[in-house]
Amino acid sequence: MHAPRFWSGGDGGWPARLLAPAAALYTLATARRMRGTGWRAPVPVLCCGNLTAGGAGKTTVALDLAARLVARGRHVHILTRGYGGRARGPLLVDPARHSAAEVGDEALLLARVAPCHVSADRAAGARAAVAAGADCLVMDDGFQNPGLRQDMGLLVIDGGSGFGNGHVLPAGPLREPVAQGCRRARAAILIGGDRTGALAHLPPALPVLRADLAMQEAAPMLAGRPAIAFAGIGRPDKFFDGLRAQGIRLAACLPFPDHHAYRPRDVRRLSAMAAVQGAVLLTTPKDAVRLPPAIRAQVRSVDVTLAWADPMAPERLLDMWLDKASS
């Protein structure tokens, strides 16, 4: 589903006021749940989380940090809920055998970098990872899940959307109040410019790392042809804007709901549009793994990575995490 418009800014107007009692109950329930004491893993645990519903860049950050740990020679394993997949886990993801319908799109991307375990029960997933030889764990999401104790919690913030209208679900996009979440965080990562003033709501003592999304050059994929871009991610407009910034000639932009399961009718529509326009179909890696096999050969996936403002900042962050966990 798409986020309601009243979540995106201002005070949310009358819909947010109408939903304020439900938001208060949600806040209370979250606070009570977070009082639980989770399982303490025998290895360091880092969580890439956020405070809002929807995409903020958590998976991109998890991929980046896990790749850095692999480069250090660490036996890092990644934990994810497997949103959009049927598997409850714990299940070690095999990209050659599992589909997005089974384990979710994010798990398939994460498994390309390091062993990835899908588990709705984070503690059970951590136990499976440790038994499989993990010497450190990176969680993709799960900041509001108390089942597994975290040595370091990171808040990933999308600079374009920030904290929306500042209200908690369902009155706004927040999973919990900003102040409450910041008390458990060790650092924040701002992706893109702070266009909504989100940083003003963070405690002054909370370290903030800055990064931008770096999109793969798409022009070589097009050979002079126009493109039809489509995406079913948290904020598809970010993907479309990134292509426009490269000067790509977009014949059409088609947003789909986050984690959309592409069906035969979607394939027929995309194929027909590409044929009529003489265009190349462009999408994100997360969408590519959800496509039916019949159309994958027609689609080009445009990768996105992180470009850190301070290239050494993520390395210092990992040092701080590992040093804290070993002390």
Swiss-Prot record:
The biological process GO terms on file are: lipid A biosynthetic process; lipopolysaccharide core region biosynthetic process
Q: Which residues bind ATP?
A: T52, A53, G54, G55, A56, G57, K58, T59
The family assignment reads:
Belongs to the LpxK family.
Q: Which GO terms describe its molecular function?
A: ATP binding; tetraacyldisaccharide 4'-kinase activity
Protein name, per record: Tetraacyldisaccharide 4'-kinase
Q: What does this protein do?
A: Transfers the gamma-phosphate of ATP to the 4'-position of a tetraacyldisaccharide 1-phosphate intermediate (termed DS-1-P) to form tetraacyldisaccharide 1,4'-bis-phosphate (lipid IVA).
Keyword annotations for this protein? ATP-binding, Kinase, Lipid A biosynthesis, Lipid biosynthesis, Lipid metabolism, Nucleotide-binding, Transferase
Pathway of this protein?
A: Glycolipid biosynthesis; lipid IV(A) biosynthesis; lipid IV(A) from (3R)-3-hydroxytetradecanoyl-[acyl-carrier-protein] and UDP-N-acetyl-alpha-D-glucosamine: step 6/6
Quick check: keyword Mitochondrion in the entry? no
Q: Mind telling me which PANTHER family this protein's record contains?
A: TETRAACYLDISACCHARIDE 4'-KINASE, TETRAACYLDISACCHARIDE 4'-KINASE, MITOCHONDRIAL-RELATED
Which enzyme type, at the first EC level? Answer: transferase
From the UniProt annotation, give the residues forming the signal peptide. none
A GO CC term attached to the entry: plasma membrane
- A Pfam family in this protein? LpxK
